[in-house]
Amino acid sequence: MLVPVLLFALGLVLLIKGGDWFVDGATGLARRFHIPEIIVGATVVSIGTTLPEVMVSATGALNGQGAMSYGNAIGSIICNTSLIAAITLAVRPAPVDVQSMKKPVIFFFVAAAVYCFAAYGMGEFTRPLGIVLLAMFVFYMVVTVRQGIKTPAPQGEEPHEDGTSVPLWKELLLLVVGAAVIAVGANLLVDNGTIIAKELGVPETVIALTFVALGTSLPELVTAITSLVKGHGSLSVGNIIGANLFNLVLVSGVSVTLAPFEVPVGKTIFGINSSLILDMPLMIVVMALLTVPALTTKKLHRWQGILLLCIYAAFCAIQFGL
C-alpha cells in the first residue's frame, strides 16, 4: 500500500511541475514570435494549466477506466468551485467585472446542458458528444482570440528575471520535457489511484472525484492563494471559472472522443446512481451559487464562500460514507 501511495504522490508532483515547465516554454515561444499577451493567456497558458486534467482523463479513458476520466473532470469542477474559489470568497470577497465573466459562464452552462443531456438521455458519453464539446472549445478559443487580437504585441525576446534573454533552446526544452513529464505523471496517477481504490475498497469514481481531482487542481489552488495574498481575489475566481469551462469542453471532450464510456456507477444513493443524483447536479449547483449572485450584484460575497465550503465538506463525507 505504501508504494502505490508514494507513486501516486510522485505522479501529482510530476503533473504540477511538468505543467509549470510546459507553460513557461510555450509562453516564452509565443512571446518570442510576438503573439499578443492576452492571446497567450487565453490559449497557451489556459491549455497548459489544464494539461494535468487532460492527460489524466485521456489516460484513464484509453486504459478502459472511464470512472477515472469522469471523476477527474467533474471532481475538478466541484473542487475548483466549492473549495478553491470558496476559500478566496470566504477570506476576501471582491467586486467582479461582469462583462468579462459573462462569456465563460454562458459557455459553461451550455456545455453542461449538452453533457447532462448525454448522461441522462443516453446513459453514456459517446464520441459525437466528445466532438461537440471539442467544437465548443475551439469556438470559445476563436471568440477569445478575436476579442484580444487588437492588443499590441510585445516586441523582442522575453527577458529573464535577471534581465537576460531566455535562449530559444531552453524554451523548446521546457516545452518538450514538460509535456513528457506530464504524460509520465498522468500514468502514475491513474495506475496507482486505481490500486489505492481497490486496496481501500472504494470505487475508482470516489478516488477520482476527491483525491485525483484535488491533485490536478493544485495549479488553480496555487494561483488562488497567490492572487489572494496580492489582493486580487476576483482574478482568482475568473481563472477558476475558465478552468471549469476547460474541464468540461476540453478535458471531457478529449477523453470521450478517444474512448467513449458509459456513465460510471461508483455508488448508489437511494438506489440511484450517484453520478446522476449527486455529482452532475452538484457541479451545476455550485457553479450557479458562485456565478449567479456575482453577475446580479456585481460582487463576490463571503456567504457564498462559507456555503460552498460547507457543501464541499458534505460532498466528501457522502463520498466516503462518513
Enumerate the predicted regions with their spans.
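Hydrophobic alpha-helical segments, chiefly the membrane-spanning helices
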Residues: M1-L322
